[in-house]
Amino acid sequence: MKRIITFILAIIGSVSIYAQEKSRLTDALKYIEDGRFIVIVEETTDIKTQSNRTMHSTRVEVKGDIGSMIWGSSDKIISNNHWNDNAVDKQAKVTTSRKKPSSIAIEIDNAFNRGYRIECNIDTDGKCSGMIYYYNEVFCIYKGRIVDLNE
């Protein structure tokens, strides 16, 4: 009898976890499919890397299949073709992963700013978290919230 009750509780638990994950996934996919949102970074942990890169990210912006990252004390933006104050022009490509559908990555691959990658994991309540890489080095871990640009 104990085994049957344990088995039933395990099934109920797994169904509940599946429902929560499906809900999380649906919200994340809504943001990704709409393709217009800003991640307002609320908390960061800067990590000193071997190449001595530390930067404080303040905002990640996604519009369709392009994305950008604004950071630093003077809101510098790293984009696809230049790095200057408050500029949002042609930004890096936004990609999604089949393994992690609630996650996006923004990859910047041009001669001047090559190697930067932002990963963003989206939760149900509009919260998100992620890491910013320079090539394979993590130099910033962040938590934030999403603002939908369509509203």
Q: What are these model-predicted stretches?
A:
Residues 1-25:
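Bacterial Sec-dependent N-terminal signal peptides
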Residues 23-27, 52-64, 70, 97-98, ...:
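Extracellular/luminal recognition modules and glycoprotein regions
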Residues 21-53:
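Tryptophan-anchored aromatic micro-motifs
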Residues 99-151:
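Beta-sheet ligand-binding and adhesion/scaffold domains
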Residues 10-13, 67, 130, 144:
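Small side chains
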Residues 51-92, 130-133:
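N-terminal glycine/threonine-rich, aromatic-flanked beta-hairpin/loop signature
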Residues 29, 75-102, 112-114, 146-151:
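Exposed acidic/polar residues on beta-strands and adjacent loops within beta-sheet cores, strongest
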